[in-house]
Amino acid sequence: MELVVQFQVLNQSCQCLAWKPHPATAWGTESQHVVAGYSDGTMRVFSISRTEMELKMQPHAAALTAIAYSTDGEMILSGGRDGLVAVSSPRTGMTIRVLADHKGFPITVLQCTRKQYHDFGVEGGELWLATSSDQRVSVWASDWLKDKCELLAWLSFPAPAGPKGFGSLPPSLATFCPWDPDTLVYVGFGVQKEALFYNLRKKQVVEKISLPYFATSISLSPAAHFMAVGFDEQLLRLLHCPDGAAQDYAGHDDTVHLCRFAPSGRHLLTASHSAVLVWELTGS
């Protein structure tokens, strides 16, 4: 691995990053744009091929905590420490919508996925979710070109009274399930240490998988029914779904604060303090 380009913004901390999705006609080529969210509420779009910043926007007054491209790459969704979610166009540099449903609680996750246009009885070719640190998840259907954005589900997962301050609690995390597009998976501070599978059609939790600790990171394989979960206890667990068969892995010297499956599902990336580990799945 070698460093090919570096972008630096003086006096600001980069809080979140997202690659622009591949155009449907150019699958197999590497996306050449990334968007970065910063501690001053700005976000910047960088061109890798031209090694330059193409756009700077400030849709937030508070630090950005989560960022994602829409599935077609035409919009950028950003979430702030104040709980606001902004939708901005990288073509025009304008913020077209601000959603305040999670106001007051930092946004921890933003994720977009495709859907059939009239699926779930609402118009829009995209589903997206926002998760905030108060154990709440909102799911939306959108068609940004028609200025459509409709709330599909508002989920609140029960949790006991915890210590004051979100930084002392395990993060609230949610992700769409790659092998079941009607389902999302949630982990976070709660009554039990578990991963919850919530079905958007049935409007209920359809599966629970017990965990040894509260999760600090999660990723689902797009290629097989595997879920990777990281913990504060320097542990990585690989789970087969739905039976919950588990395999634990050591090798981290701190909290496993990030885990991401590669699109092929054959490799898993994990991060712990200053170390980045790459795992290869064999026999799966």
Protein language model annotation of sequence segments:
Residues 23, 30-31, 73, 116, ...:
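Conserved loop/turn motif of beta-propeller repeat scaffolds
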Residues 11-26, 62-69, 104-121, 161-177, ...:
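Canonical WD40 repeat/beta-propeller blade segments in eukaryotic WD-repeat proteins
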Residues 34, 76, 128-129, 184, ...:
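Hydrophobic beta-strand positions that form the internal "hydrophobic ladder"
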Residues 37-40, 79-82, 131-134, 187-191, ...:
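Conserved strand-to-loop turn within each blade of WD40 beta-propeller repeats
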Residues 1-2, 51-52, 93, 145-147, ...:
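Short coil/turn linkers that define WD40 beta-propeller blade boundaries
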Residues 3-9, 53-59, 95-102, 150-157, ...:
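Short C-terminal beta-strands that terminate individual repeats in beta-propeller domains
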Residues 1, 43-47, 85-90, 137-142, ...:
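WD40-repeat beta-propellers
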Residues 257-284:
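Blade-level signature of beta-propeller repeat domains, shared across WD40, Kelch, NHL, RCC1
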